[in-house]
Amino acid sequence: MRTAIALAALCLFAAACERAPESDAAFGARVKAWMMAHPDDLRAALENMQTKTGAEDAKAEAASIQQAQAALPRLRAALERDPRDFAANPSGKVTVTEFYDYRCPHCINIASKVVGLIRARPDVRFVFKEMPIFGPVSEHAARAALAAKAEGKDYVGLYAAMMAARPLDDAEIDRLAAARGVSLPAIDAPAAIARDDAQIVQTEKLAEQLSIDGTPGFIVGDTIIHGEDFDQLVAAIDKAKAKA
């Protein structure tokens, strides 16, 4: 806010008079004096800047949403049918795709509801997109989950356990994975790391095309949901089911 006020003052001051050669301190003093003498003009300028910025942000957001919606049809197969991703309830008539990180607070908050939905709604096919954006520990967790998928282990159980773990570190990830029969050497094998990292990069690019720049993000039919709004997720599922 202080920066915006200063910018508004400088713009108005520059419009009111040309700056003569002088020291920065002297110029700053003159700007401050002008601000004190013209509070109403300064307030009006600041409000105008905020209105303009808000309108520009809203316009950019609307354009981004429109582009993401337009991209959905051509990205549908990558979203819902990538054989590298784990899909719970594979025979479900409606597909939900989640982009998430095991250390994302919002992903953690909604995770138990996601697991409950998977268990309560066998008609809902749920695709997991590993998108670790919180650093090396998140990347290790994603690789552990992908190893569970590759080995046919309890993916949903590992997902739930890692989301619930406090704290989640490499040792805890390995413990939880091993408890579900995942081969720990398979997680960090060079070939597995290269394969998984390539998949994660592709997932991030897919999310970018859908204007998903954070986690969690959900796709249900033609609906893109940003954040942990479970009620919106359920509503989108019911809407998609009605169309199926």
Residue ranges and their predicted role:
Residues 2-8:
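Sec-dependent signal peptide recognition
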Residues 5, 19-34, 52, 178-244:
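C-terminal cap of thioredoxin/glutaredoxin-like
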Residues 13-16:
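C-terminal motif of bacterial Sec signal peptides marking the signal peptidase cleavage site
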Residues 24-78:
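Extracytoplasmic c-type cytochrome modules immediately beyond a signal peptide or single-pass transmembrane anchor
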Residues 76-94, 118-119:
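A short beta-strand-turn-helix
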Residues 97, 108-179, 208, 212-213:
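Structural alpha/beta surface segment adjacent to cysteine/selenocysteine redox centers
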Residues 100-103, 214:
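Short pre-active-site segment immediately N-terminal to redox-active cysteine/selenocysteine motifs
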Residues 104-110, 217-219:
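The canonical Cys-X-X-Cys-His
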